[in-house]
A protein has these predicted regions:
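Switch/connector loops and helix/strand junctions flanking conserved nucleotide-binding motifs
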Residues: 32, 109-110, 139-143
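Arginine/glycine-rich "motif VI" loop of SF2 helicases in the C-terminal RecA-like domain
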Residues: 67-68, 118-126
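Accessory nucleic acid-recognition modules appended to NTPase machines
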Residues: 1-97
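Domain-level recognition of nuclease-like catalytic cores that cleave nucleotide substrates
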Residues: 135-157
Length: 157
């Protein structure tokens, strides 16, 4: 019913002392519990909940796809003491890292990529790519090893 994502860090101590992120596996149930329906999501009436629901949905989808992945990975989240955040961090057994940021917006701003840039810096040569999934329709390069992609990309890969 729930999933717990441990915190990602470049060392074991950071992973152990940081708080995990908990979310419901069923995003429809989560939306119902907070009183959000399809109409309010479309109209962004409940925008304070939209991002969290979308993030939970994407995390659940990635966890499902993990079972079929050619490269086994674990799923984490990242938040540091300065406020840098990456919603989801996939890490392979060889410690290769992919950062995934989720935005409910149809347009993007420069600040939306700061967390991915930070994780890229922390992971160093183990960083494979950073992906910002958003409600837009275009895939766009946003810097070395980083892309913005529509959320629908989850089903087209």
């Amino acid at each position: 019913l729930i999933d717990v994502l441990p915190a990602w860090g470049t060392n074991l101590t950071r992973r152990v002392i940081s708080k995990p992120k908990v979310f419901l596996q069923d995003s429809t149930m989560a939306a119902s519990l907070v009183g959000v329906d399809a109409e309010s999501l479309e109209m962004q009436i409940s925008s304070s909940f939209t991002g969290g629901l979308l993030e939970s949905f994407v995390a659940t989808e990635l966890l499902k796809q993990r079972e079929r992945s050619a490269v086994p990975f674990n799923l984490f989240h990242f938040r540091d003491s300065t406020g840098k955040v990456v919603d989801l961090v996939m890490e392979s057994r060889s410690r290769e890292v992919v950062g995934v940021e989720v935005k409910a917006a149809v347009s993007l701003q420069g600040k939306d990529f700061s967390g991915l840039r930070h994780v890229q810096k922390l992971a160093g040569n183990k960083f494979r790519c950073g992906i910002l999934l958003y409600a837009g329709k275009e895939s766009l390069p946003i810097g070395p090893g980083r892309w913005a992609m529509p959320i629908s990309t989850l089903w087209s890969v």
